[in-house]
């Protein structure tokens, strides 16, 4: 099984034009912060995920680098702990699933059942 060799995280501002009037916010949003995560394995495959902004993840990358890329149960347990302490690491979860799907040659929806 391949191992995770790198995690690349970039943060972006998605411009909303026209502004988006979210039902929970009285001010229309003109931009939305997002994160794109790229996870690369030792076989050169890359999984990509995106979602809510992920600040401060660098301290936690060591819990994934060198680990089996396809061990999704393990990764989910680590992500649940990170979520409790640091918040919103779910773009990484999506990238890990994307990588697992590419490794298996299946779409993620099929792997989920």
Residue ranges and their predicted role:
Residues 1-47:
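Structured beta-strand/loop patches that form or line metal/cofactor-binding pockets in enzymes
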Residues 6, 38-107:
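Metal- or metallocofactor-binding catalytic centers and their adjacent structured scaffolds
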Residues 109-113:
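Short, intrinsically disordered, charge-balanced linker/junction segments flanking boundaries
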